[in-house]
Regions:
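N-terminal alpha-helical modules
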Residues: 32-237
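Classical Sec-dependent N-terminal signal peptides that target proteins to the secretory pathway
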Residues: 1-33
């Protein structure tokens, strides 16, 4: 049974089937293009390519998608597919360079999801007219200086720019941390893999954050304050 037959069994109406199948087909097409380049670069045999595809087809349907909304189904499928491909690529390629290539592939695929869900979340915020002028918060002292009809700061855009700076700073730290650990332990290629894993994990956290907010905006019309680095709002870990 191929992956699209399984998808058809998950959805119950013709409209849902068409939307879900099209969305997933588009994601597979983009991912396959990137995968083919990687397969070609590392001379991955056809049987190993088929093995990865088969394993990931099985992996994405381990969970029961039918109890989720269409939006959640698509997201769960996307991340499960990428994670499975990264894991199986690493096993097939085997070498340190191959594992690093698989992690870089995962980073690129999650970066596509970052752009996708940032745009969807942004569109939903605008649709619900949730933007707020700079200074229009009770804790900001310049609230009285906001003139009626004045266009304020795009807080979501500013937040995303701040996150991009945070990402760059985090990745710079990870590289220095890797160099230090490598030096202390007298070398070891495993540390470069740890570095790439940490880099990918940071990006995945942001993608999940944006998707969660997008889903909350659609279902509840609001979002919660997000913690970062495992810290709660009150500062506890």
């Amino acid at each position: 049974m191929n992956i699209f037959t399984r998808l058809f069994k998950v959805s119950t109406t013709g409209t849902k089937i068409k939307i879900l199948a099209f969305a997933i087909f588009a994601n597979i097409a983009f991912a396959n293009e990137s995968l083919q380049k990687l397969f070609k670069e590392y001379n991955v045999s056809k049987d190993k390519q088929e093995y990865i595809n088969k394993e990931c087809n099985k992996e994405v349907f381990k969970d029961n998608f039918k109890d989720l909304s269409k939006i959640e189904q698509i997201y769960k499928f996307e991340v499960a597919r990428i994670d499975c491909e990264v894991n199986n690529l690493g096993e097939v390629l085997g070498s340190t360079q191959g594992i690093l290539a698989s992690l870089n592939y995962g980073y690129d695929e999650y970066d596509k999801l970052l752009n996708k869900y940032y745009k969807l979340y942004r569109a939903e915020v605008k649709k619900q007219n949730k933007t707020t002028p700079t200074g229009a918060f009770s804790h900001e002292p310049n609230i009285q200086n906001i003139k009626k009809g004045q266009k304020g700061q795009d807080t979501l855009l500013e937040e995303q720019r701040a996150w991009l700076k945070l990402r760059d700073s985090y990745e710079a730290y990870i590289r220095k941390h890797h160099a230090h650990i490598y030096d202390i332990n007298g070398g070891g290629t495993i540390y470069s893999i740890h570095t790439s894993n940490a880099r990918l994990g940071f990006l995945k956290m942001r993608v999940n954050e944006l998707f969660s907010r997008y889903l909350m905006m659609i279902t509840d019309g609001g979002v919660e304050f997000d913690s970062i680095f495992g810290s709660n709002v009150d500062g506890d870990i």
